[in-house]
């Protein structure tokens, strides 16, 4: 009973935060919601993954995938790491949260980089001339949950992202992708989200 009440409390807080956010537009960028706004929401969403605590074992490492030769990508990655570092203690309950930037332009083997840094969650910045399927193949094989601020990446195969719906941020979830990466998202979260991909019709 307490667990259910806690889940609804988190859901209420998340809905309140989404409703309170004013619209902001980032010109010439692919992210739909400003990084400083999206990161706290995405981290709250992670609280709805029933499998995350067991996989993280007290310490969650968020990898931030970017391209150093693509300025937009590099700038977003910098902002994401800064936003993660600025989160208050307890943002993920008792789990310690850390960030590691992974430069795709300087990485010959993404799977090795993720394993070496013990990444459990991967934020994907805007990428250029990259086959997203190569990223999702690695994330699914390693059981790493993917996040992004680029809505179309979720439709293409990443697990969780944010879009704008009117004047408010909208949670977007590719349910099949999230399950393929090992996440077990609660029904409470799915009711708050726009579900896309193969799992959209059967939550």
Briefly describe each language-model feature range.
Residues 2-5, 10, 17, 21-203:
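Short hydrophobic alpha-helices and adjacent helix-cap/hinge residues
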């Amino acid at each position: 009973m307490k667990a259910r009440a806690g889940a609804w409390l988190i859901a209420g807080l998340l809905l309140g935060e989404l409703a309170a956010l004013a619209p902001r537009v980032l010109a010439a960028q692919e992210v739909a919601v400003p990084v400083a706004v999206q990161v706290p929401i995405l981290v709250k969403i992670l609280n709805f993954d029933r499998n995350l605590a067991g996989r993280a074992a007290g310490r969650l490492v968020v990898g931030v995938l970017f391209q150093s030769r693509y300025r937009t990508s590099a700038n977003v990655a910098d902002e994401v790491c800064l936003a993660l570092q600025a989160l208050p203690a307890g943002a993920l309950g008792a789990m310690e949260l850390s960030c590691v930037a992974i430069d795709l332009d300087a990485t010959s083997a993404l799977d090795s980089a993720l394993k070496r840094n013990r990444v459990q969650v991967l934020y994907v910045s805007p990428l250029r001339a990259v086959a997203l399927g190569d990223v999702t193949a690695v994330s699914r094989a390693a059981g790493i949950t993917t996040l992004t601020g680029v809505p179309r990446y979720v439709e293409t195969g990443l697990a969780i992202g944010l879009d704008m719906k009117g004047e408010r941020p909208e949670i977007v979830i590719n349910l099949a992708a999230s399950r393929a990466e090992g996440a077990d998202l609660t029904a409470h979260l799915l009711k708050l989200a726009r579900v896309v991909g193969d799992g959209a019709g059967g939550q």
